[in-house]
Amino acid sequence: MVDFPYSSAPLRTIKEVQFGLFSPEEVRAISVAKIEFPETMDETQMRAKVGGLNDPRLGSIDRNFKCQTCGEGMNDCPGHFGHIELAKPVFHIGFISKIKKVCECVCMHCGKLLLDEYNELMRQAIKIKDPKRRFNAVWSLCKAKMVCDTEVPSEDDPSKYISRGGCGNAQPSIRKDGLSLVGTWKKDKNAEDADQPEKRIISAEEILNVFKHISPEDSWRLGFNEDFSRPEWMLLTVLPVPPPPVRPSISFNESQRGEDDLTYKLGDILKANINVQRLEINGSPQHVIQESESLLQFHVATYMDNDIAGQPQAVQKSGRPIKSIRARLKGKEGRIRGNLMGKRVDFSARTVISGDPNLDLDQVGVPKSIAKTLTYPEVVTPYNIDRLTQLVRNGPNEHPGAKYVIRDNGDRIDLRYSKRAGDIQLQYGWKVERHIMDDDPVLFNRQPSLHKMSMMAHRVKVMPYSTFRLNLSVTSPYNADFDGDEMNLHVPQSEETRAELSQLCAVPLQIVSPQSNKPCMGIVQDTLCGIRKMTLRDTFIELDQVLNMLYWIPDWDGVIPTPTILKPKPLWSGKQLLSMAIPSGIHLQRFDEGTTYLSPKDNGMLIIDGQIIFGVVDKKTVGSSSGGLIHVVTREKGPEVCAKLFGNIQKVVNYWLLHNGFSIGIGDTIADEKTMREITDAIALAKKKVEEVTKEAQANLLTAKHGMTLRESFEDNVVRYLNEARDKAGRSAEVNLKDLNNVKQMVSAGSKGSFINIAQMSACVGQQSVEGKRIAFGFADRTLPHFSKDDYSPESKGFVENSYLRGLTPQEFFFHAMGGREGLIDTAVKTAETGYIQRRLVKALEDIMVHYDGTTRNSLGNIIQFVYGEDGMDAAHIEKQSIDTIPGSDLAFEKRYRIDLLNPNYALDPNLLESGTEIVGDLKLQNLLDEEYKQLVQDRHFLRKIFMDGEHNWPLPVNIRRIIQNAQQTFRIDSTKPTDLSIQDVVQGVRGLQERLLVLRGKSQILQEAQENAITLFCCLLRSRLATRRVITEYRLTKQTFEWVLNNIEAQFLRSIVHPGEMVGVLAAQSIGEPATQMTLNTFHFAGVASKKVTSGVPRLKEILNVAKNMKTPSLTVYLEESYATDQEKAKLIRSAIEHTTLKSVTVASEIYYDPDPSSTVIEEDEEIIQLHFSLMDEETEASLKHQSPWLLRLELDRVAMTDKDLTMGQVGEKIKETFKNDLFVIWSEDNAEKLIIRCRVVRDPKTLDAEAEAEEDHMLKKIENTMLESITLRGVQDITRVVMMKYDRKVPSETGEYHKIPEWVLETDGVNLSEVMSVPGVDPTRIYTNSFIDIMNVLGIEAGRAALYKEVYNVIASDGSYVNYRHMALLVDVMTSQGFLMSVTRHGFNRADTGALMRCSFEETVEILFEAGAAAELDDCSGVSENVILGQMAPIGTGSFDVMIDDESLIKYMPEQKLSTAVEVNDGGATPYNSDAGLVNTKVDIKDELMFSPLVEAGTSDAIASGGFTAYGGADYGGATSPFSGYGNGPTSPGFGDVSSPGFSPTSPAYSPTSPSYSPTSPSYSPTSPSYSPTSPSYSPTSPSYSPTSPSYSPTSPSYSPTSPSYSPTSPSYSPTSPSYSPTSPSYSPTSPSYSPTSPSYSPTSPSYSPTSPSYSPTSPSYSPTSPSYSPTSPSYSPTSPSYSPTSPSYSPTSPSYSPTSPSYSPTSPSYSPTSPQYSPRSPSYSPSFNNNDKEQKDENGTH
């Protein structure tokens, strides 16, 4: 074999996998050796035997021998197959049932299909495209055909017959018996032994011959494939022998070897095979041969599958079953799941974790020993050669060091053993495997990884000692604690992987979780406890401590804030110092009960511009709650700032707490005497009540509640009293604890503990329960031997009246242990259950992704949703918002929204508008306003129709309220001044904005419809918030501000759209599976409550996902029509009409008497009935008298039940008569009789009357009695066993338009019969609901089924108090219903879909699926996730769903000509530097190197701004153009950065570009009052948004800007295409525009300085190529062989001492070079030494380029 030279070229990927069966010819062709001997070694026991099982041609298994086929050694030879020629064909065990089915389809004589196109059904079957389904359809038709027809009736003329070429033979019925098939042939009717059918084993040989005769057409009809799977290949004639590397033997010593199970089994097969051959040659009798044939069959079968039902397992000598090939593949530890889907990996570490509050949120402390073991391969470039050389010198044992050097030819130098490690001269392009160092991104994970937040990217911080350290706040998403948990760390091994980690998985980016659109991290533990203590009223801090604390505020500006209290001594409040950690521009308000703007109780929360105004900061504010501080900061300022906020808060609070102290002791659980008395009283009272109830029960005075038995009602009362007692006791304990109490402090801060904990510690532990009931009686009617029999007292049934503080009595302790044990078992069972549910969900949804056309599809390309989540939004960007058009009365609505310029009541106050007086009576304007108001009224009706209960808080993108608040703050809105807004501006502005909000782009009808649906709700919100009246009267926005608000809404909206490539399926599966893990397994919340029992929690989720046909608790919720719903009596009527009442349920007793005379009776009680009935006899009765039987069936009915069900005797009697017609003679007593009796006699039929019949009459009557009781329905609907009336509140709008609650009666049933109940008069068929979504689907169709399914999934998750965003559950139910039937999330549901075989086999039934795939010759196109994981390829998902291409033509076409230089140039994250400074030398922005090619580039710091600007703190970050986080919130698209003068909002900002559609003379930021804008400035040029001479940052002394720079020109139009405010929805942005180039993410064809022909601008500027940082085709001195060496600069060489970025003597002639310039650092990717020289020289020669 040739030794290929090392190559870095990527390997070809596998595009598709074709399954099939091996034909005998192929097996022989592949084989390199025919195996004939069962021995492995030859006689010497030293070398492998030729022709034996370890034939040397199969591959070497010994270090001493080379492989005879390929000549490689043991490590390089992959092994080669051999083959065994079988003496007789045998069945392949995997296909035996398929072989049987094929035998049933074809004639067993001539091999022809038994049916063909002449049969109508068959014609349909053959049209099925999918081979497996076609085979099943053909088989189900053919299996009934028992003869091979020679001719069939013609279609045109049924009397004529057409020949079809059959042979006319009868077909056997075939049955599988063990490993053989048995055929039974029915004889002809007129044959003499017709009743003795012929029965014999059909041999494999026979079947093989038949299958060989199957024609190609027939084989295709049977779902086979001529090229890859013929039916006869399912039988084995030649057996492939796997090479030894598949079945390696283990050697004990030189002579002894232990063979692998497969080798052992192959030996058995060979022995049996030789045996059969010998018998054949010897001509032994048939039955002897058959015997040994079946042995061969057995060995071949167990070699492949040793778990065959009904077959003995093949065992080794020791009795251990052999591990067959099937066992190697299947199951969790098997090949597929254990070695292909999941492997062990390199570059990972695992150790115990501990907390460290001094680390940043996204850091991880890595032990030095681990940092020295794990490495990262870094390629040597001019920028890092010095650093890497130093690391190589340090060697492998000193921490920042290196372990290996890899040369460009692939050789590894191990620095542990290299003698001359110190003097290795590194060359460009080599790799150094260096230790991991601070700030490397690594992936950190804790199992079980239930959601994506269980694997996040952290920054390394190398630390001493041996545990991983992490910030406390990041433990909640990992669900970690420090009681011994271990975590794993993985080091990425390529730049691309590092980029993905830092840009997609970084902890800050996961703060807001898409699972429930709220943060998944918050302040926890001591910091949370401390933050509450610190922000209480009257917490003051003195000067010395304040000064210390200010040092703990990481970005403190050096200004000591004014103290809150000046005299007698200066004091600062805790709120004040905490505010210093909160970034400015943050607004938050939350009102709790009783909060006003003065907040006397200091509850609620108000933060304005980052200052805490009032409110104690607790879990509600800084916990992981929706709309809390964490959420707002992430949304407003970006993830990075939010991550810093965590650190800031922790540092400040922990320092304060350290000095203030907090501890808890046993004393905190002790209540005072008065409280203890209250507690004792409460418990005594409860016990007294229980005693009373017990007495009542014993005296039989209790009445059962409806739907409950007496005993249930009794238990219910007792449990209620006892729980009341515990709560009351707990409440008094809690109320009487002082606020200083440490337990109470923790509970109220939310850091630990709850009300129940206080109650149990101090007051009373309460009732213990097992399975939701009180402790049950064990032996002899007692719970424990310490109690007397039948003791129902609280003590005996497990009520613990002591508190933990007091201590439990032995009995109490025992009961408490019982309750606790149940909890433990529950948890253990739940873990396994939910783990499996999670796995099924993930496997069912794993391949669902948002595609580039906005649709959500699976790997087959089937559309699951037209728009993800039906609105195309990313769940993380969504917040709950109130749609104000829904609530409130009509009058209030009109007051809030209507403007009528002609009607003084609804006119605008003229003082509000500058144009206030001019607009009065303007009809044209009024029309505009009327249209707006009409639309709002329409919205109101529309929304009220959808949200029938008037709910108006819905999760929507873009928090408009906050944007308006930020605008008012930023632009310092003065609410006393009139605004310069005009009404047209508002109405048209909002209208224009709605048209620009595109989720989907495209003109086709379906896209338009989806687009409309996606934004309908958001537009309603938008119109309700930005209605003209509100904008002018409520918010008082100016024209400038209003435009800023609109632009901001648009930018944030576009940023909220979900990214194509997002794997939303897995996200949904995790979002549902993770809460399920937290759920309680068996919910006993309804312990005895008088209502329907409902399965919930995990068991219910299991039912839903399995689409279980028979649920545990099917139930209907029946809503009634208006007139019935409010009237209890009418509702009762319907209840009795629905509740299924059988005769049995009203019968007390039934008896059979011998009462010979029909007209009198032996039963005294019944004489009255007889007299009444026979006093008036009609002829019919008289006629039947003589035929009546002497046997009498007598039923006694239950009067209570009868009145309850509202039945009369007449109704019951008539019903019986109706059922049995004339066969039964029935009479009954009056309704008011003492006992309600029904008498029935059989009326005999004189024709059939004989002695025998007469003797059996009483038996017959017994049968009649059973039938009667069971099957006679007196009233109600079948299957509805019980109906309970419940009173629910219904929210409906009143006359005034306000929502109010109306109580209504609703029926809850046990049992479901939807179609019947719907048609009961009085039932409201539009609102009826059942939890059996299968019924809903059957009655109302799949769409209704989907809605019901969603509601059920939602209820399960909500029952536990969790919230999961709509889109996740919607995606799951859409997948389950997308095929038009309910597809379960089990192996029978989604795993039977038409996805690739590799993907299906990685779930369950691995081997069976692969067999099936082989027989049907399936083709897997490898588009799913699992397929690519198995093949070890990058799956086409996420960052793998596209390729990045370089446009070679443009590289040549657009040569950079001159250099444009600006005061500030922002180079952003694209790999295209937009022709800014062709050589990228003098860029004024330091781009952080790790973010170079990232679409989410972090802002660079531009020192033109850093040197002053109008910023408060100096320095501002600008985000990249492509960054959706626009500099994490400081761009013009982000509200809340400082004030107008901040560069983020002013024309000095490079982020504003005149070409940007949102920049116009009317644009809010273009205002003559803007402090940094001066039109009088002589060199002011409106085309240069980023140049302003009045800016203090422009000064000749500014190091980064020099007017003498040859490239400087005051009029230079420094157009910067990187403007982040450029918006793709701008009219000029159109993919069809000829000048549009998708490679430049933010370039706009309308740019004045852009012209496709202009050579000076190129979207893919050639001057930058990521692979060669210093490559520029225009540089004459460039030579491809030396990327960084330039002959024009003789003194420059990488090793030259003058090459030192810090050396001031380096290139001092470059006018723009300044040794102090912070950007000039080898870290900066835009720094290139060779260019500096080249450019300088070229400038000197040509003046400019």
From Swiss-Prot:
Q: A single Gene Ontology molecular function, please? A: RNA-directed RNA polymerase activity
Its recorded reaction(s) are:
RNA(n) + a ribonucleoside 5'-triphosphate = RNA(n+1) + diphosphate
UniProt feature, compositional bias: Basic and acidic residues: 1734-1745
Location(s), subcellular:
Nucleus
Q: Which domain of life is it from?
A: Eukaryota
UniProt note: domains: The C-terminal domain (CTD) serves as a platform for assembly of factors that regulate transcription initiation, elongation, termination and mRNA processing.
Q: Which protein, by its recorded name, is this? A: DNA-directed RNA polymerase II subunit RPB1
Q: What is the lineage of its organism?
A: Eukaryota, Fungi, Dikarya, Ascomycota, Saccharomycotina
